């Protein structure tokens, strides 16, 4: 997609998986750049990408101003490095579904400041283990078992009983140029020398998915052209390919429909899930989160947004 092409409010809402009213609110708060054509508000893809990048820090979605908490910083694992205050509940992960969830928490969870930390699945679990957050989200695939999340929760939270709560299922696959000129169809195509990759950052679920498949095929990542070129979101992976700067990237299906010049090769269904420590499961805030996830009101937020299978939302998947 051309970075300067005009996007409508609905286009941006679809890309970010939020309601149109939320887009207007982001503009009003100065968090999302825009311009006007007559009386119509318009955006560029660069505006949306900048918003995503600027959002990758601790924020309180319920406040009108940008409320990044400067005392929460990143350690060498990409995790947070301060224990939250007693009235703070930090939900960690990168899907914008979590922005909607924390907004609902601000509405329904009394005496709690619901905060967001925008870091990937692996680092989220490390932060949960260290006590820097209360809820991690993860979509990590274990190549040996073919299972999502449970093996990683057990490894990264040793000795800590945890509860895994289902959020949504999404389809992961390859972004390729329109028409698939390189005829890319499976993981085996990564063995080819004529393909350039655009990668996600270490610890992201899509990065782990790629690395696990490479491991199973006996391929070193360093042998792939472009493997060390990393970006921080599905959107920037897709837009890099649309510009011709790479041939292939791993991401979720929804974004492919939002970026011109991109086709999507579906590969596998993934599970995106919430992880909390069992010791806080019976607290009012966690029980409120369960009620929110299971409510028709919350589920209706995703009714008109493609790419989310919410049929199991709010179900307890495993106790570790």
Regions found by a protein language model. Name each.
Residues 84-94, 188-208:
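Short loop->beta-strand "edge-of-pocket" segments that line small-molecule binding or catalytic clefts
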Residues 167, 176-197:
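Flexible hinge/capping segments at coil-to-helix
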Residues 102-110, 188, 200-202, 206-227:
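Ligand-binding cleft/hinge of the Venus flytrap
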Residues 139-153, 238-268:
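A ligand-binding cleft/hinge motif common to bilobed small-molecule-binding domains
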Residues 124-171:
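Short beta-strand-centered segments that line the small-molecule binding cleft or hinge
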Residues 1-123, 129-132, 156-161, 296-320:
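N-terminal hydrophobic or amphipathic helices and topogenic motifs
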Residues 117-126, 222-239:
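Short helix-initiation/N-cap motifs at beta->coil->alpha
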Residues 158-159, 164-171, 259-291, 310-318:
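Periplasmic-binding protein-like
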């Amino acid at each position: 997609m051309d970075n300067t092409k005009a996007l409508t409010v609905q286009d941006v809402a679809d890309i970010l998986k939020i309601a149109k009213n939320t887009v207007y609110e982001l503009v009003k708060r100065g968090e999302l750049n825009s311009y006007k054509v007559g009386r119509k508000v318009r955006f560029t893809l660069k505006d949306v990408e900048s918003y995503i990048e600027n959002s990758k820090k601790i924020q309180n979605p319920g406040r009108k101003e940008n409320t990044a908490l400067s005392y929460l910083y990143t350690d060498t694992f990409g995790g947070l490095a301060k224990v939250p205050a007693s009235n703070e509940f930090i939900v960690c992960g990168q899907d914008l579904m979590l922005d909607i969830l924390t907004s609902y928490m601000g509405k329904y969870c009394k005496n709690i400041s619901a905060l967001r930390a925008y870091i990937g699945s692996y680092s989220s679990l490390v932060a949960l283990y260290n006590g820097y957050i209360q809820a991690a989200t993860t979509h990590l695939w274990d190549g040996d078992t073919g299972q999502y999340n449970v093996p990683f929760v057990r490894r990264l939270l040793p000795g800590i009983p945890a509860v895994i709560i289902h959020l949504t299922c999404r389809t992961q696959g390859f972004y390729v140029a329109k028409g698939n000129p390189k005829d890319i169809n499976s993981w085996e195509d990564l063995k080819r020398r004529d393909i350039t990759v655009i990668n996600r950052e270490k610890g992201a679920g899509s990065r782990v998915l790629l690395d696990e498949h490479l491991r199973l095929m006996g391929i070193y990542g360093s042998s792939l052209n472009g493997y060390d070129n990393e970006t921080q979101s599905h959107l920037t992976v897709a837009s890099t390919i649309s510009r011709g700067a790479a041939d292939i990237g791993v991401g979720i299906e929804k974004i492919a429909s939002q970026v011109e010049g991109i086709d999507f090769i579906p590969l596998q269904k993934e599970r995106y899930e919430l992880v909390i420590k069992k010791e806080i499961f019976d607290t009012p805030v966690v029980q409120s989160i369960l009620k929110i996830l299971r409510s028709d009101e919350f589920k209706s937020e995703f009714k008109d947004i493609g790419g989310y299978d919410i049929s199991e939302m709010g179900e307890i998947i495993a106790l570790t």
